[in-house]
Design a protein with these regions (language model features):
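Hydrophobic beta-strand scaffold residues
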Residues: 77, 125-128, 199
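Short, low-complexity disordered leader/linker segments with a strong preference
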Residues: 1-46, 116-126, 326
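Extracytoplasmic "Venus flytrap"
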Residues: 46-73, 78-95, 99-101, 107-111, ...
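Hydrophobic alpha-helical segments within soluble ligand-binding/sensing domains
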Residues: 89, 144-169, 181-182, 209-213, ...
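Hydrophobic alpha-helical
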Residues: 103-121, 187, 198-201, 205-266
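Short, solvent-exposed amphipathic alpha-helices that sit
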Residues: 58-75, 152-156, 179-197, 211, ...
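Hinge/cleft segment of the Venus flytrap/periplasmic-binding protein
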Residues: 20, 43, 190-192, 280-326
Length: 326
């Protein structure tokens, strides 16, 4: 059930399976109802979107779902990729505003540094729907649609506590995103009740596999020996797994992620990865499309929408679509 709140070099052979999965992942890689263009029924609506990065196929799936609905109505979707650069994202938003978009769908690179662009959108009378995260000032947006990110961290921590009597844990974070912070916070808050679980290292992976692998390698080179790794998302988890396997430590280390990516589910099925708290980019995209048109048509809509998450483990992974997203 969706929760809502009302509101208007050479690679060693042993590492190749994980990196192959990683390569697949990378390759896939306020209601302003009086806005002038909305009243012009004979002209297509223009919806702008900008996600923190299109290097994560999670956002490509969301965008595809939006595009299916928007283009089926004869409207226009303009998608931009800031590539994890907040200044670039702010500039993209300014450009979209100059292109006379009617509404902006946003996944911010930095939930705080996005505010100047949000203020410009508000001044232009363009409503903003935030997806898969939050912003520091929710008064500047019409609606926020996100998975239960804090709950995703809780699920991973509870599984660790139910399967290991104690653990030394490494965290792979993405501090500039509210969603990433909430996942790690939910995980840490849950472990905090038991002194047998300790955080012994942490690094910022920016949610990217190609960053997570060397960051995890650095920690291991420093002599850190984790029993578990909590990653804010599946690309980071896959990067951590590659580093752990390079050091011959993967078999003894529990690895957790968040997303439910096909590659992660495959690794869980093979016993290489422990679990992932699964999101549904398909559902997120569908809900976003519904909300976009509710706002533009002056209909009632929910200001906050929280989409539940579930934990995928080796025990239940076969009940999920192994080749696609939820």
């Amino acid at each position: 059930m969706v929760s809502t709140t009302k509101g208007k070099g050479g690679i060693p052979l042993r590492t190749r399976p994980i990196l192959a999965a990683a390569a697949l992942l990378l390759a896939a890689g306020l209601a302003a109802v009086t806005h002038q263009a909305v009243s012009q029924a004979d002209e297509p609506l223009r919806i702008g979107t900008t996600y923190m990065t299109m290097n994560n196929p999670f956002y490509s799936v969301i965008d595809e779902e939006l595009r299916l609905v928007i283009e089926s109505r004869g409207d226009i979707l303009l998608t931009r990729d800031p590539a994890l650069d907040q200044e670039r994202q702010n500039e993209e938003i300014r450009d979209l505003l100059h292109e006379n978009i009617d509404l902006l769908v946003l996944n911010p690179v930095d939930y705080r540094e996005i505010e100047p662009a949000l203020q410009e959108a508000q001044k232009a009378g363009v409503p903003v729907v935030v997806i898969d995260s939050q912003v520091s000032n929710p008064d500047l947006v019409a609606c926020t649609i996100a998975s239960d990110n804090y709950g995703a961290g809780v699920l991973c921590a509870e599984h660790l506590m139910n399967t290991r009597d104690s653990a030394k844990v490494v965290l792979l974070e993405h501090a500039s995103t509210k969603s990433g912070r909430d996942r790690i916070q939910g995980f840490c808050d849950t472990l905090a009740s038991d002194v047998n679980y300790q955080i012994i290292g942490r690094a910022d992976s920016a949610g990217q596999l190609e960053v997570a692998m060397p960051e995890m390698d650095k920690l291991l080179e420093q002599g850190i020996v984790p029993d578990a790794v909590m990653s804010l998302n599946d690309p980071s988890a896959l990067g951590a797994m590659a580093a752990l396997q390079e050091h011959g430590m993967l078999q003894d280390t529990a690895v957790y992620g968040v997303d439910g990516a096909p590659e992660a589910k495959s690794m869980i099925s093979e016993g290489a990865m422990t679990a992932t708290a699964t999101q549904s980019p398909i559902r997120l995209g569908q809900i976003t499309a519904q909300t976009v048109y509710a706002i533009l048509n002056g209909e009632d809509y929910e200001k906050e929408i929280t989409v539940p998450v579930a934990l995928v483990t080796r025990d239940n992974v076969n009940s999920y679509d192994m080749d696609g997203w939820q």
